Each structure stands twice: as structure tokens, then as C-alpha cells.
């Protein structure tokens, strides 16, 4: 994985597209709130913002909330968003971005939903942005 990341950075430098303006949306998804910020490749990020999680709502409301948060953070990005990192509680299929939470009284409504495609469908401006799902600690 590290090799591919280095290869990608090198390509961006070679083709003149540069990564200096490329931004990443960072989300820490909790049951009560979602913390979010925007970062550049050097780790310089905006102030962390807090949003209500709506973890006990319907599928549509949860997905619309994720999309709304991404849109708000995109406005803070001075450049294009090339990636979205989501730290999210388990059980969760982190490789495929699919929630496996059931019976936890949070995010039950998004069980089995592929989050990347659902969020991109609601926020087409994310285009080819890559998603990375990580276990929250």
C-alpha cells in the first residue's frame, strides 16, 4: 500500500497536477457526533468541526447526513478533494466500506449499505475521490 501511495504522489508531481491543492476530508464517525475536518497531504488541517450523527435515524437520513457533512467540508477545501477518510465503529467491512452494525442502537439502518457509492451518489462533486475506511479507536 505504501508503495502505491508513493507512486501516486510521484505521478502527481510529474504530470504537473501537483498535490499541494489536493485536499482530503477526514471524518471520525461516532454514535452521538461526527467530527470532521479537511487536510492537505502534509497533514495541515482545518479546525475540527462537530456534526450530529443521527445514528438512530432511517437509512436515507443517515446517508443524507454523511453527504451534507461532506458537502460542508468540501466548501472549506481550497482545491479539489481527492480522498475521504472515515474512522467508523465496527462491526464494519473496512475493505469494502459496508456497515455490519446491527442491534447496537446506532447505524442499524445502514447495515449492508456500500457507503462510498451511496455518498458519491449524493455528492457527485466527489467524483473520483478515493475512500478509506478505518476502525475508530
Give residue spans per PLM region.
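Intrinsic-disorder-associated, low-complexity terminal segments enriched in Asp/Asn/His/Tyr and depleted
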Residues: 3, 8-10
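Short glycine-rich, Thr/Ser-proximal phosphate-binding strand/loop in the N-terminal lobe
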Residues: 20-62, 98-101
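N-terminal phosphate-binding loop and adjacent alpha-helix
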Residues: 45-80, 108-117
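Glycine-rich phosphate-binding loop and adjoining helix at the ATP-binding site
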Residues: 55, 63-64, 92-137
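Short glycine-aspartate micro-motif
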Residues: 24-28, 81-85, 132
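Short glycine-rich anion-binding loops that position phosphate/pyrophosphate groups of nucleotides
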Residues: 32, 89-92
